[in-house]
Amino acid sequence: GFDFARHPYPELAARFMEHYNAGVPGCAVTAHAVDTLQTLARMGWQQAVLSASRRDYLIEQVSARGLQGFFTELLGLADIYGVSKVQLGTDYLRRTGIDPAACVMVGDTDHDAAVAAAIGATCVLYTGGHQSRARLEKASPYVIDDLAQLPALLETI
């Protein structure tokens, strides 16, 4: 664990983000992501990003990869402390009038499944992140190994 008396959380968060942001330029877009985003747009799905990243970082990351045109909104936090994706998602749904039951949240962690449940959305988990398929299957009945599988799965949910 961390001794926050010796290393305050804001200090640790800032140091983490320095290292994290330094590696971002080397991260490529996941295989089949662009094709899947295009397919979902053609299918009429409204797409937004809900992230624990700071919003200005998120905008920069999405824009640098030429993906901004796919999303109606980029929902990121106001600071680097990653406090509440649930609140961000809930506020977005309330503000837009979107029915949470009509939403599908795509993520890659069991935390994403917990966020989806908290806001009332269905969750699809992608195995391309750092958590195992077995762990993801405990969190959601919908788990995919390739983003290209997403459009067909959405037709069945």
Annotate each PLM feature:
Residues R6-P8, G69-E73, P100-V104:
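Short acidic capping loops at alpha-helix termini that bridge into adjacent secondary structure
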Residues P10, E18-V49, R55-V62, V86:
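Short, acidic loop-to-helix structural element flanking the phosphoryl-transfer center
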Residues H32, Y57-E60, V115, R135, ...:
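Phosphate- and divalent-cation-binding pockets in alpha/beta enzyme and binding domains
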Residues S63-R65, L77-A78, V86-Y92:
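Anionic-ligand binding region
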Residues K85-A114:
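Conserved Lys-Pro-Asp/Glu-containing loop-to-beta segment of HAD-superfamily phosphomonoesterases
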Residues V104-V143:
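Acidic, Mg2+-coordinating phosphoryl-transfer loop and its flanking beta/alpha structural elements
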